[in-house]
């Protein structure tokens, strides 16, 4: 995986360090494919830095080919990254994070999923999802009904 030296670096990353960061989705795919309990989820997890507009990484998968789960993970990943305190900065307030992420609504993030995440964040439920509570999951399903297996986009591998 990515070295903690890079992940915890308090200064701007070099081009080489950023290139290492951009490899982690491929490592996610490889690692999860070797764990039978997670194999079915590996391509979804690996797509979490892809964007609807096809400008994500590492595979530049266009939105129509991204799985529903990957779209949810993309929103959750950025939200968590911005709200969490890191060695190099304090976590940002939820309102500021929503404002930052809103700039990518419909280009990086699925609009419906982003709107559902905003609703969860505004009522405080999104924070509790880090504990994956049944209540939070049920609220997410009410806001964005989860697609059935037949409706899911094709996975990448």
Spans of features found by a protein language model:
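Metal-dependent catalytic cores of enzymes that make or break cyclic nucleotides
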Residues: 1-157
């Amino acid at each position: 995986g990515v070295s903690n030296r890079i992940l915890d670096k308090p200064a701007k990353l070099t081009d080489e360090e950023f290139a290492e960061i951009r490899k982690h989705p491929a490592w996610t795919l490889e690692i999860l494919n070797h764990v039978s309990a997670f194999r079915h989820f590996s391509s979804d997890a690996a797509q979490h830095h892809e964007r609807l507009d096809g400008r994500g990484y590492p595979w530049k998968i266009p939105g129509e080919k991204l799985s529903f789960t990957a779209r949810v993970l993309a929103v959750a990943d950025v939200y968590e990254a911005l709200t969490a305190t890191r060695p190099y900065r304090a976590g940002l307030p939820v309102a500021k994070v929503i404002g930052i992420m809103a700039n990518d609504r419909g280009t990086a993030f699925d609009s419906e999923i982003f709107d559902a995440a905003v609703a969860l964040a505004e009522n405080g439920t999104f924070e509790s999802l880090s504990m994956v509570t049944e209540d939070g999951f049920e609220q997410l399903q009410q806001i964005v009904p989860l697609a059935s297996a037949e409706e899911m986009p094709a996975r990448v591998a």
